[in-house]
Amino acid sequence: GMATVGSYYSSGYGNMPYEEFTLTLTKIARASQPSINTYPGNSPDITAGTACTIHMNKQANFTHKVSYWFGNKKGTIATGVVDNCSWTPPTSLLDQIPNASTGSGTISVETYSGSTKIGETKSCGFTLHLPNNSEPTIGTITLTEQHAGVKAKNANVTVQQISKKLVSVPVSAKYSASIKTVTCDGVTLSNNNGTYTGYISNKSNGTYKITATDSRGLQSSNAAEQTFYEYDKPFITAALKRESETSAEGTLSVNGPY
């Protein structure tokens, strides 16, 4: 740029201008400061599997090398970038946060004039979010009747107080999470190579609700429905009444609903 400089000398009459001249100043090259999605300010929230834009905010005709660092993973996004570049954070990065829904990372930019690096490497932070629908996947729920009587009549119904079902359902977590618990109507099911099983009885309805929770705390639910039949087990009341206090004989009365 240009600057006007004045030179003064002192006399008994005060400071008097002596000479005025113009200097041409050399422009100092500065490294570019990156930002995400907006510029010059940074908008750090991005989603795995969704493209974002990384702005260079350059001050001269420079090119740039853009890199990322997330957890123990790092890599080059692009080289020779002039103004901006697009980056889709791979979902494979999510194996760095198996127990969290977000994680922090860094975008780094090296600035070049030709092959000469300008200044220090500049960076900006980002917060990586899970994609939508990252909850556990619940497969087909299988209900197998264990009571011989119900099974003989119709194994695909639930009979109050009698039915006992073996519940079996495949469940899997997404994006490097692990399954923490799987329940059916509040009863914890056991894991057998990704298929969760358990026995459910004493039902008051025909709905079998599966709830799966992963290591990130994300939940999903699904349910199987069966026709439900109310049923009360038969019972009787019996009373024996002597004919007299000394009699060896009496009357037995038996009653019960059916």
Can you name each region flagged by the protein language model?
Residues 26-51, 131-160, 228-249:
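Short, compositionally biased P/S/T/A/G/V-rich stretches that sit at domain boundaries
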Residues 1, 91-105, 118, 197-206:
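Surface-exposed, short loops/turns at beta-strand junctions within beta-sandwich domains
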Residues 76-85, 186-194:
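Short beta-strand segments within Ig-like beta-sandwich modules, predominantly Fibronectin type-III
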Residues 17-24, 116-129, 218-228:
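Edge beta-strands of extracellular beta-sandwich domains
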Residues 8-33, 133:
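Exposed low-complexity, polar/acidic, P/S/T/G-rich flexible segments that act as propeptides
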Residues 48-60, 161, 165-175, 250-258:
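Aromatic/hydrophobic beta-strand junction motif of beta-rich domains
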Residues 109-111, 212-214:
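Conserved structural position at the C-terminal beta-strand
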